[in-house]
Amino acid sequence: MKMAGWKKKLCPGHHLWALGCYMLLAVVSLRLSLRFKCDVDSLDLESRDFQSQHCRDMLYNSLKLPAKRSINCSGITRGDQEAVVQALLDNLEVKKKRPPLTDTYYLNITRDCERFKAQRKFIQFPLSKEELDFPIAYSMVVHEKIENFERLLRAVYAPQNIYCVHVDVKSPETFKEAVKAIISCFPNVFMASKLVPVVYASWSRVQADLNCMEDLLQSSVSWKYLLNTCGTDFPIKTNAEMVLALKMLKGKNSMESEVPSESKKNRWKYRYEVTDTLYPTSKMKDPPPDNLPMFTGNAYFVASRAFVQHVLDNPKSQILVEWVKDTYSPDEHLWATLQRAPWMPGSVPSHPKYHISDMTAIARLVKWQYHEGDVSMGAPYAPCSGIHRRAICIYGAGDLYWILQNHHLLANKFDPRVDDNVLQCLEEYLRHKAIYGTEL
């Protein structure tokens, strides 16, 4: 009755006006419906529609990655000790632990790529023009644990970026097939054209990245920087935050590069040979080419496109590459030394003032067991709340607040078999920040 009275007031009694009145009502109704309608498939964060809180909420609800267990991720990311303790206790309850997703699961779900991407909640459009205009390249080296790989890919995925995946030749066939099935669902993710068997601490780890470098440079995507990852890495910044950090480098690279200790100098004093493992020989190596000063770091880098091009094409770089092939863990001194070489784009001088620690570089955040301690007594970080493997912390929920205070783009190591709560909370945090631009 009230609606009828309202119509009469708006359109008083003349039949000639009836059509116009109903048209007016239709326009009002249409505008109201459009106000609450969002085309999530074609939305981006800078579109007019996205300024609506309603649309933003709809998008987040369609893409959110909430922790599957009853833990307080917002509290954990803010360092709330009660929330952390509850998460650590929850992680100890074996009956609550979910078995990891299998190769077979991914082989089945990827038969329908659209269903796979929707169900696993991949972001399938650029979230801003700034990100669209600044594509990032990834070299992803993996050998096991298919769910870890898929979750890492989902966390760093953006349709404007480009991803090269290198799978260890020694990996099980079902794992290789599952990786192929996943990447077949994305036009900007591909398998490296040349695969090698990767042996711990040997040259093959570098060769895997070099193979991806060659493929990525041949891609049609005009990427600006290359990041390399392994299966235990995870981003701690959104893609938008990474773009901002990379732009601030202004063409420079960012990677650990320090003076080697005496023990590390032994890594290139003798030749090493590879069978199933790496072992030293009694054959001494010649000094580095052109007496180039050697530096040490780690396997991870943030490298400009020009740096990558010079790694592959510059004759001086190629001489050094050949020289380090029979050293121990060459990935930990090749990149660090090239970063101080004067002919390399984006490098820094070899002077001590330019030494770069892993905490100063933005490439990777790692918590080493022998550096852990009481921060009030000068230790660089508190003890690991997870466990240690090869003296590296596999993070637990108690580490997440500290992790998020750092400027690095990615952190290492994560393993859902050790603590899935920290990974789930990090996923939830990153997805919320990507959509809303704010923390949990």
UniProtKB/Swiss-Prot annotation:
Chain positions carrying an annotated carbohydrate: 72, 108
Lumenal-side segments: 31-440
Pathway membership, UniProt: Protein modification; protein glycosylation
Subcellular location: Host Golgi apparatus membrane
Keywords attached to this entry: Disulfide bond, Glycoprotein, Glycosyltransferase, Host Golgi apparatus, Host membrane, Membrane, Signal-anchor, Transferase, Transmembrane, Transmembrane helix
GO biological process: protein glycosylation
Reaction(s) catalysed by this chain's protein: a 3-O-[beta-D-galactosyl-(1->3)-N-acetyl-alpha-D-galactosaminyl]-L-seryl-[protein] + UDP-N-acetyl-alpha-D-glucosamine = 3-O-{beta-D-galactosyl-(1->3)-[N-acetyl-beta-D-glucosaminyl-(1->6)]-N-acetyl-alpha-D-galactosaminyl}-L-seryl-[protein] + UDP + H(+); a 3-O-[beta-D-galactosyl-(1->3)-N-acetyl-alpha-D-galactosaminyl]-L-threonyl-[protein] + UDP-N-acetyl-alpha-D-glucosamine = a 3-O-{beta-D-galactosyl-(1->3)-[N-acetyl-beta-D-glucosaminyl-(1->6)]-N-acetyl-alpha-D-galactosaminyl}-L-threonyl-[protein] + UDP + H(+); a beta-D-Gal-(1->4)-beta-D-GlcNAc-(1->3)-beta-D-Gal-(1->4)-beta-D-GlcNAc derivative + UDP-N-acetyl-alpha-D-glucosamine = a beta-D-Gal-(1->4)-beta-D-GlcNAc-(1->3)-[beta-D-GlcNAc-(1->6)]-beta-D-Gal-(1->4)-N-acetyl-beta-D-glucosaminyl derivative + UDP + H(+); 3-O-[N-acetyl-beta-D-glucosaminyl-(1->3)-N-acetyl-alpha-D-galactosaminyl]-L-seryl-[protein] + UDP-N-acetyl-alpha-D-glucosamine = 3-O-[N-acetyl-beta-D-glucosaminyl-(1->3)-[N-acetyl-beta-D-glucosaminyl-(1->6)]-N-acetyl-alpha-D-galactosaminyl]-L-seryl-[protein] + UDP + H(+)
This enzyme's EC code(s): 2.4.1.102, 2.4.1.148, 2.4.1.150
Top EC group: transferase
UniProt-listed PANTHER family: BETA-1,3-GALACTOSYL-O-GLYCOSYL-GLYCOPROTEIN BETA-1,6-N-ACETYLGLUCOSAMINYLTRANSFERASE 3, GLYCOSYLTRANSFERASE 14 FAMILY MEMBER
Protein role: Non-essential glycosyltransferase that can synthesize all known mucin beta 6 N-acetylglucosaminides. Mediates core 2 and core 4 O-glycan branching, 2 important steps in mucin-type biosynthesis. Has also I-branching enzyme activity by converting linear into branched poly-N-acetyllactosaminoglycans. Contributes to the post-translational modifications of structural proteins.
Protein name (record): Beta-1,3-galactosyl-O-glycosyl-glycoprotein beta-1,6-N-acetylglucosaminyltransferase
Organism of provenance: Bovine herpesvirus 4 (strain LVR140) (BoHV-4)
